[in-house]
Amino acid sequence: MSIEHTSHDPSKPDPAKARTLAAALPWLKRYHGKIVVVKYGGNAMTDETLKRAFAEDIAFLRFAGFKPVVVHGGGPQISTMLDRLGIRSEFRGGLRVTTPEAMDVVRMVLVGQVQRELVGLINEHGPLAVGCSGEDAGLFTAEPANTVIDGEEVDLGLVGEVARVRPESVLDLIEAGRIPVVSSVAPDADGQVHNVNADSAAAALAVALGAEKLLVLTDVEGLYLDWPSSDDVIGEISPEALEEILPTLASGMVPKMGACLQAVRNGVPRATVVDGREPHAVLLELFTNEGVGTQVLPGVETKTRKARDTQS
């Protein structure tokens, strides 16, 4: 009896993969069984590859023993639907005014489109994700946002901030082994639904849940030390140092860094803005020493690095 040998050699074990997995051990130990709140937004919401990578990351966290919670907005999708329906947008100080007519669209898009798509992508990896909004079980109570532009208060209509969080419904989902996916709409004390800022909503929820970490996805590498004069990106910064420079930041970074500051000031141990343009950015941030963003962490000296795009 002869044994036929194929010309194809079996793949050899890859020690590099083993080292990568072993390097994740400290982070697995730190976050195992802990709640991590992730604010989903930016390019990760519009690029098909990044959408799927994000959903894989969130499912991975759940199977690795983390307790992920996702909060999302949907600015680009809202704008697209308003244009499609022929609803004219009014802007004040560069910010959209949310009229009652526009609010109906906001609610429809966030709860009925963005949330459903993300829940579906996560659930390709198992029956994990459950969608909800700030309206469900009284999760969020909103109040009108106090928006000041160039020293003057501006009325943006039905735009709100989270005034109160009742986290019990989300905690019930977490206890059942589910991944809550939360849309950032919420009623005020009179029942009028508002479009709430998803960054600050994620921070408020992270505080109420006693989360171990808040991640906020964005479309830049992190917080630049002196943009556009410098290509130095801040890797770590203390709440005190961030509070000092917050008024000088570009308008797009203020709500994101403000959310991180809000979370850490109110008991979340660490909060990070993450470069959501990077596939699997959530895993890279949580499981590597370098991370892919700017972390707000009490008691640290400000640390910087060169932006990746400028490195040779």
Swiss-Prot record:
It is found in: Cytoplasm. InterPro entries: AceGlu_kinase-like_sf, AcgluKinase_fam, ArgB, Asp/Glu/Uridylate_kinase, Glu/AcGlu_kinase, NAGK-C. Keywords: Amino-acid biosynthesis, Arginine biosynthesis, ATP-binding, Cytoplasm, Kinase, Nucleotide-binding, Transferase. It is an enzyme of class 2 (transferase). One of its GO terms (biological process) is arginine biosynthetic process via ornithine. Pathway: Amino-acid biosynthesis; L-arginine biosynthesis; N(2)-acetyl-L-ornithine from L-glutamate: step 2/4. One of its GO terms (molecular function) is acetylglutamate kinase activity. GO terms for cellular component: cytoplasm. The record marks K39, K256 as: Transition state stabilizer. Catalyzes the ATP-dependent phosphorylation of N-acetyl-L-glutamate. Belongs to the acetylglutamate kinase family. ArgB subfamily. NCBIfam families: argB (TIGR00761). HAMAP family: ArgB. This is Acetylglutamate kinase.
